[in-house]
Swiss-Prot record:
Keywords: Ribonucleoprotein, Ribosomal protein, RNA-binding, rRNA-binding. Part of the 30S ribosomal subunit. Contacts proteins S4 and S8. NCBIfam families: rpsE_bact (TIGR01021). The N-terminal domain interacts with the head of the 30S subunit; the C-terminal domain interacts with the body and contacts protein S4. The interaction surface between S4 and S5 is involved in control of translational fidelity. This is Small ribosomal subunit protein uS5. With S4 and S12 plays an important role in translational accuracy. Located at the back of the 30S subunit body where it stabilizes the conformation of the head with respect to the body. PANTHER family: MITOCHONDRIAL RIBOSOMAL PROTEIN S5. SUPFAM superfamilies: dsRNA-binding domain-like, Ribosomal protein S5 domain 2-like. GO terms for biological process: translation. It comes from Mannheimia succiniciproducens (strain KCTC 0769BP / MBEL55E). HAMAP family: Ribosomal_uS5_B.
Amino acid sequence: MANIEKQAGELQEKLIAVNRVSKTVKGGRIMSFTALTVVGDGNGRVGFGYGKAREVPAAIQKAMEKARRNMINVALHEGTLQHPVKGIHTGSRVFMQPASEGTGIIAGGAMRAVLEVAGVRNVLSKAYGSTNPINVVRATIDALANMKSPEMVAAKRGKTVDEILG
């Protein structure tokens, strides 16, 4: 699970999973390792990376580099989400909704790590279907990327924020 946390400048890095995989060839098995990591600035930017190498440290390093390259911006509202969102990736489905101050991050495993590094402080969430960490992380990132702020909606509709919010 999310067991390594480092500060790289202003970025928080979390290691979610390390897995040993093998390729069978004529001469036997070739072992290698995969690593799944998330990186965020704690203020609405988050990304994930998946690295594979013959040694664990090299796999983690590759995953961190990919995570830094694949960051997205998330429109947060006072440390929580703008509105309830759903995300899907293959067999994993996630549902997240805003929570009041003091609730904390109610999420399991891989989803919790993504929300923590993104800077979300209060959220209620649930993962349905497959709980494979890679798919849950991708579904969570999908849900966060699809979340729209009232300013974004107002700009798209050509209205003011007050008209959108009623």
